[in-house]
């Protein structure tokens, strides 16, 4: 019994992370990291970025400077709630204001004199409007006193049209590990980026590349375009670190394989030969000469000393305040990795590994845009001052330059889906699935331009570094995003940290490292470098590395550093480094701690008894060594046991090899995959397809559906699922339902439900089963004069409009009805006409196939009249609509049967839905049967022994055997009726019933699987996809039907359709469709000399080619299709001559007919 209790403990600890933790300020775990990210930006980082004091221009050897100072940054929340914003049709924005002062500083003997040039106190209500993130319960970071709506999880922005916007998280381009690349055989590069810490603004970026060619080892250089000299990497390391070449040789060779040592000796010897080739070589003189040559090459306006200081001081910005000697040792450690990676490439994290990348969250998006737009703003002010001084001789700034920071345009572009000129960042939230409010903000994707042809296939594979941190099931199965977008697992989150916290944490870690004996942290020749965010701070004695890492991890868990998400990675495998990561954008998740071969969960006997009354933060405080937050880099270089069960089966010696132990399999799924049931009991593709279909499931009504002029599909009578997982419950996906329980039967029905066809009961539909309401936005823009014009002739299209020209509320719109008045008028130039004014209707019509009721109408009056109409329509299931179970058993309505046509059981109950039974075997969805069994068992005993209602926990991925669930169902039925026989009990457990034929009232020979299941209706609706029409608009060029339902399009008649008719021998039909219709008929004159199509000049047809040669062409009129004429014209325009030739033969009636011998063959 103890073993079972222990195996459940890890599951209970995992559940504690998922539930809210008010003591730690966590009210909704799935999106908490997004709330914190945006809160850090709006409350802290925005002030840091906008508060600026720096020189714009300098004159007379820097004795005169034009300065800019931005201060008094204030951020004001809106006065209204998100619902009011939706009603008004406005965006939900915070207002940021600041003061700009531009002055001139003159340095004189008496001191510095300041002369004011310009000042602007920004109080404009439209200066900077920052889209405000709506948090859990309609709260926002600036005003937490807003009333609480618990089921509103937030995580969205509202744009100016009251449309919700959500976005994915992008993988940052800059990597934290250098990128290794094989240029050609025996030629390699090692490129890396250096970014200044967050406390240094503006952020400085430097990108360096180390090149190595085996055939030219003297040219093993490091370079950076226009920011650094091109210099031998060994000599640069020697110049910075002030050590000998022998020291560098010993440092690079320590603990390296023989082949790497050979290459090290060759590189050091080549550097030595380079120094010997220069007479009286001096390393300082050598570097100075290179700097002077670069100064001349760049034609810099700075003095040589200023140029050298700028170049060397800004070298490696991430080690900005670090001595040059440590920079030199850092370069040696990089060169060590480079040389090792040449021989052991597979052991080094590649560029696609998530170990190398940080992730941009909502706050980081806005931070990056604010930083870039501020630099543009300051640059515009600088250019304006220079232009005014050049043209007028005065230092002045135009007021419009000061009042247009440009941040509004950047933020609105962000919500429109453009982040730094790339796509895929944000998108409109589709309201057909409440679940996507969670899934989209927890998605991680690559930049579109990151995916080049050369690396496309390597990126799109499931990378090993994504294991445990990403959901392996919830990935796009088709389309351009395959392999590029991944979903975080339920335990994963993304780190956030304030600048002040970052500096304090860095200081505490440095103090801890320096508390060691000085000689033990100064092993720069053969030690393990210790880096904090890639900045070298010490080099540790190799004999102390295990004790150091173990002690550091223990102190971290105990809160010694004040941050539980610090990552410490011990990189062995000859690369020898201790990496400490504290920055934002890292993927972290909890793991169970293994210390000296013992699972720390077992060492705390009090934990089990107190666990029910504790939150996750309580566990971290009172039992700090049980769980550790581990980032993805630390996880990759640690030994992690897959499960507690496997860990317990190992010997003591094997256990000591592990550092961490993982939680059960259900915690490796994302929140979308957690809505499925029994993934591990089904075939693999069902999980991927199931996640895609769960996102398309229509969910319950949103919070203020009537106030948003937005598209949406909503389930009318949703039901909470009975069979759920813990993640589904804690994320409130279960409470905000996405389906209904229906009674299904697995059987064949008159051959109608073949393949994916399903039979649905008519009375079930009439009672509101899986009924939905569709909200649709219709938007038109009308010129003001057209809107004010009055119609001269009564039009049926305007029958639903009121006298004000707008459609009236609660009117039922049909196809062809106008939604607003739009009458264009024109004046005829005819003096004899009585009325030379003509008018005609140009309004946009309602085009849907179904009638809709007008719910709301919004109007904006500017230079144009913008009308937005929200229509509602109840949509009951019809033929062709799609449904699915949570095991990816998608079906299409093939027949709607009356109750009298359906089979029934002994109680007269008929199934709501009949599904083809062979689909279970072909798709191998055993968990669908388990879900029916568990749902039926719940209906028999919906309460536990304490009288409390309890849903059935059936996790998406679980390690529970099917026999356990069968035993649970057996206990439910025995509790309800203990006198059941073994056969009756078996039938109830396995949901097998005898059904009766409705026509003969006789029982079927076989028992039928019959029971309840949670059924989902998908957004694929028949009436939204039908595009068949008899007549309609055509394109001007090829005169084929338009594409898309919105443009009134139809189905094009192309080559494949033509071939089908040819196969049927329908020659007259082809002629009629492709040629004889009045739109496609085309008369063409062909020149019989050259085969060109004749041109029409002043109503005269002539051949241009023959007329230039003074020939007399013979033009013949032929009838052909318009498309043929367009094809010939386009081919001629591309330089391809297509000659139309006529068949030369005499007419058949001029030639005598051939004689036919009618004699029988035997007489011939």
Swiss-Prot record:
Top-level enzyme category: transferase
Keyword list, A-Z: DNA-directed RNA polymerase, Metal-binding, Nucleotidyltransferase, Phosphoprotein, Transcription, Transferase, Virion
InterPro entries: DNA-dir_RNA_pol_su2 (IPR015712), DNA-dir_RNAP_su2_dom (IPR007120), DNA-dir_RNAP_su2_hyb_sf (IPR037033), RNA_pol_132_poxvirus (IPR024390), RNA_pol_bsu_CS (IPR007121), RNA_pol_Rpb2_3 (IPR007645), RNA_pol_Rpb2_5 (IPR007647), RNA_pol_Rpb2_7 (IPR007641)
Source species of the chain: Variola virus
Annotated catalysed reactions: RNA(n) + a ribonucleoside 5'-triphosphate = RNA(n+1) + diphosphate
Function: Part of the DNA-dependent RNA polymerase which catalyzes the transcription of viral DNA into RNA using the four ribonucleoside triphosphates as substrates. Responsible for the transcription of early, intermediate and late genes. DNA-dependent RNA polymerase associates with the early transcription factor (ETF), itself composed of OPG118 and OPG133, thereby allowing the early genes transcription. Late transcription, and probably also intermediate transcription, require newly synthesized RNA polymerase.
Name of the molecule in the record: DNA-directed RNA polymerase 133 kDa polypeptide
Main location: virion
GO biological-process terms attached to the record: DNA-templated transcription
Keyword NAD part of the UniProt annotation: no
MF (Gene Ontology): DNA binding; DNA-directed RNA polymerase activity; metal ion binding; ribonucleoside binding
GO cellular component term, pick one: virion component
Domain of life: Viruses
Location in the cell: Virion
Oligomeric form and interacting partners: The DNA-dependent RNA polymerase used for intermediate and late genes expression consists of eight subunits 147 kDa, 133 kDa, 35 kDa, 30 kDa, 22 kDa, 19 kDa, 18 kDa and 7 kDa totalling more than 500 kDa in mass. The same holoenzyme, with the addition of the transcription-specificity factor RAP94, is used for early gene expression.
